[in-house]
Amino acid sequence: MFHLRTCAAKLRPLTASQTVKTFSQNRPAAARTFQQIRCYSAPVAAEPFLSGTSSNYVEEMYCAWLENPKSVHKSWDIFFRNTNAGAPPGTAYQSPLPLSRGSLAAVAHAQSLVEAQPNVDKLVEDHLAVQSLIRAYQIRGHHVAQLDPLGILDADLDSSVPADIISSTDKLGFYGLDESDLDKVFHLPTTTFIGGQESALPLREIIRRLEMAYCQHIGVEFMFINDLEQCQWIRQKFETPGIMQFTNEEKRTLLARLVRSTRFEEFLQRKWSSEKRFGLEGCEVLIPALKTIIDKSSENGVDYVIMGMPHRGRLNVLANVIRKELEQIFCQFDSKLEAADEGSGDVKYHLGMYHRRINRVTDRNITLSLVANPSHLEAADPVVMGKTKAEQFYCGDTEGKKVMSILLHGDAAFAGQGIVYETFHLSDLPSYTTHGTVHVVVNNQIGFTTDPRMARSSPYPTDVARVVNAPIFHVNSDDPEAVMYVCKVAAEWRSTFHKDVVVDLVCYRRNGHNEMDEPMFTQPLMYKQIRKQKPVLQKYAELLVSQGVVNQPEYEEEISKYDKICEEAFARSKDEKILHIKHWLDSPWPGFFTLDGQPRSMSCPSTGLTEDILTHIGNVASSVPVENFTIHGGLSRILKTRGEMVKNRTVDWALAEYMAFGSLLKEGIHIRLSGQDVERGTFSHRHHVLHDQNVDKRTCIPMNHLWPNQAPYTVCNSSLSEYGVLGFELGFAMASPNALVLWEAQFGDFHNTAQCIIDQFICPGQAKWVRQNGIVLLLPHGMEGMGPEHSSARPERFLQMCNDDPDVLPDLKEANFDINQLYDCNWVVVNCSTPGNFFHVLRRQILLPFRKPLIIFTPKSLLRHPEARSSFDEMLPGTHFQRVIPEDGPAAQNPENVKRLLFCTGKVYYDLTRERKARDMVGQVAITRIEQLSPFPFDLLLKEVQKYPNAELAWCQEEHKNQGYYDYVKPRLRTTISRAKPVWYAGRDPAAAPATGNKKTHLTELQRLLDTAFDLDVFKNFS
């Protein structure tokens, strides 16, 4: 079978799916119609099936051959035997022997028999017509399904019924059939399951069953999937007669869940009628839908579900799916309660949650996590995916059988936000796949006030999912049983095929965008219909009462019981005196903090290493730890250079990174480095993945060969996405504090396409959601004449969002001042000028007793700069990250003679030292490097200023004046010295673009800033 699958894969073009016998009904084969015998005279290479144009037919023939080799022509029998033996398709096929003269006579006789049977052609045409009819329903039946609960809109935005869908007998002529054929019995093809145990049905019954399967309250989009097995699986789930049956107990459970969903919203409306809560009215069926997905997934072995969703219905999901204590939810409506935790907090419909409980349907433990998110719709999608991937990684769930994700979407956002597309394209990448996500779209057919026809160009809001061959199940939300069935199928699909699936809940929004909004301004006719619409709970209760499943008193008792639960929780909420944001934590780290959520210490050990460890890592970094592995000649030279550096006890940038990573792996810290081209490195400096030059796709990661029991190292080239991938890595870093998760931009300039993740999650995440995160951003930065899009990581933006006060000098005598600063800041911003300091800051990120995002402006030209080297001595035990690197030359020996103290950061230091040496001013100008910009090293800089009492102060940067670090550094330096001296500026003039694209202009600007930095008279006119 494997060989045939391989063969079929080679032959299969991207055609519409046909059939696979694996799922076909057990029924007698249809009577074969007579075919004209072919005289085989074409060469093997000309056989059309070898070109891949008939791959579906080949697979059907193969399935028939498996059941009975004699049921296919001898040539097929030989072909399949050869293929199973391992022969390639071209040699496996052997043409049948040419026909003899006697055989040709037999052909002529057979032809005369055909001519004597004029009805044969009609029979064949009728059967082909029926097959086309069935296929038309499978492909386009969803277009005429009754999906809108209001009955006024077409879910696909098309009011015309497709001409090739049979919904009335007058359209039979399209297929060459007529009304007289309705009672004629037709054999059913293997591509349908409408027959159940029957192999033939009258045309009238075929149409009726197809209408029931595809044109009622469920619309199924799946025929674009180019996998026969998957298509056949879906057909079986929706076409089999009587398959959508529920027991009375299941119906009562569904009713009870609808009661909870509906009465929760009504309770909030009664108690807080003027509060925004973004209620679920109009799609109350979402709660039982989610619970059904979770129930079925739990039954299939899932024990951890990570969810992401927008504001619509969030409180209801927290209450009735995740089972957050109701009193904690009600407390969020009390404006008098103050928050006990540090930080700004967030509105109630953004908060996340983590809860472990027993699933009552399966009686198994299940953990539910709802990720906190901002109002930026769909921004949490990749975050959820990353967290899911991490949880799967840490529990060894390589197939996604234990941990899964559910993403909820609004219809307008699902179609309108590009991050949805980016996230979908991560779904099947080896280093990013979560083995299938269940997407649930709350399709209330409106986006705030915008009509769907103005919100998307595609027929459905879900069409983006087609790019990854995810089946899409549209369902009318006013048919709760149809919704439950679709959700069961979605969970089963994900469990079976480990691929994404979409459930489109076509519903409506009973109120405005929020409870204070008036929708009649913009959608008057729609809301007139909504005002007349019975709630789904009332409809379903009436149905069950009429069926005798429940009686009216039982239904009313269920309502009273839940109302009582809400009232009792409301009473308890009045006893609460304070709000605890940490009760809403979506990603707890058990054992990392104390029980009250505080760090276990406020100190950081030395980040240095013994020389033996440094040497061992360096030796592995400069070798190929796999036998018979041929690397590129240019890479051999790079590894040789690394080996020489190790012998000389020095490191460059790439080797320093290698040593930081390797040492953390030894300590059991998982490291994940992701981004565009990170395996080699944009600047061809890293080479963490070696490629065999003689064996295709054979690779080696030396970092995973360092120690016997080391943690795994994951380095992965990402898709060409910043927004999606950075969100994914942020989510991965949320799962555990004991991992170093890094995202590297190809150039720092490109991080701004991920600005939403930076602004809404990384920068304020802890303040809003009491959630620490240790993600590291590596942003290549430096003005090197490469133009405005390859020069600046926009440090001014990161620094502007730092939360320290530039006008307040902190208590510099405080114990562990530097660690306390790190604990209080919202993120750490550094620009290292030496490989050794880069090594230390990476290790410090893990050795700190808490986690903060780390922004590193990394170099480009310094990667190979001969002066950008560090000695092993700077990395040995007892050494630390240097927040400030002071002047250590002649100027430091005679500080009273220093006329100017230049402060700078990053690469420009090397330009300054070169110019200072050329001007012979090493005794007159001192240069101090600020390596850690935020939190600002007030204490160390005060010492530097005091050391040079006669020096004027200047900040020098290569960036333009309105960019870079100047506006951040100047007020803090002034505060440090109590505004005793001015802080002058030496750098480029203000500009709109980050850099010039002209090399000559670049060099002119550089020389001008160097002239300013070393002209001791330049600032006298401004005094």
Swiss-Prot record:
Mg(2+) binds at residues 411, 444, 446. Calcium ions and ADP stimulate, whereas ATP and NADH reduce catalytic activity. One of its GO terms (cellular component) is mitochondrial matrix. There is a cross-link at residue 534 (Glycyl lysine isopeptide (Lys-Gly) (interchain with G-Cter in ubiquitin)). The modification Phosphoserine is found at residue 100. It comes from the Eukaryota. Its EC number is 1.2.4.2. GO terms for molecular function: heat shock protein binding; metal ion binding; oxoglutarate dehydrogenase (NAD+) activity; oxoglutarate dehydrogenase (succinyl-transferring) activity; protein-folding chaperone binding; thiamine pyrophosphate binding. Residues 1-40 form a transit peptide. Its main location: mitochondrion. Its cofactor is thiamine diphosphate; Mg(2+). Ca(2+) binds at residues 143, 156, 158. The modification N6-acetyllysine is found at residues 401, 970. Gene3D superfamilies: 3.40.50.12470, 3.40.50.970, Multifunctional 2-oxoglutarate metabolism enzyme, C-terminal domain (3.40.50.11610), TPP helical domain (1.10.287.1150). It catalyses: N(6)-[(R)-lipoyl]-L-lysyl-[protein] + 2-oxoglutarate + H(+) = N(6)-[(R)-S(8)-succinyldihydrolipoyl]-L-lysyl-[protein] + CO2. Keywords: Acetylation, Calcium, Glycolysis, Isopeptide bond, Magnesium, Metal-binding, Mitochondrion, Nucleus, Oxidoreductase, Phosphoprotein, Thiamine pyrophosphate, Transit peptide, Ubl conjugation. GO terms for biological process: 2-oxoglutarate metabolic process; cerebellar cortex development; generation of precursor metabolites and energy; glycolytic process; hippocampus development; NADH metabolic process; olfactory bulb mitral cell layer development; pyramidal neuron development. It is found in: Mitochondrion; Nucleus. Belongs to the alpha-ketoglutarate dehydrogenase family. 2-oxoglutarate dehydrogenase (E1o) component of the 2-oxoglutarate dehydrogenase complex (OGDHC). Participates in the first step, rate limiting for the overall conversion of 2-oxoglutarate to succinyl-CoA and CO(2) catalyzed by the whole OGDHC. Catalyzes the irreversible decarboxylation of 2-oxoglutarate (alpha-ketoglutarate) via the thiamine diphosphate (ThDP) cofactor and subsequent transfer of the decarboxylated acyl intermediate on an oxidized dihydrolipoyl group that is covalently amidated to the E2 enzyme (dihydrolipoyllysine-residue succinyltransferase or DLST). This is 2-oxoglutarate dehydrogenase complex component E1. It comes from Homo sapiens (Human). The lineage of its organism: Eukaryota, Metazoa, Chordata, Craniata, Vertebrata. The gene is OGDH.
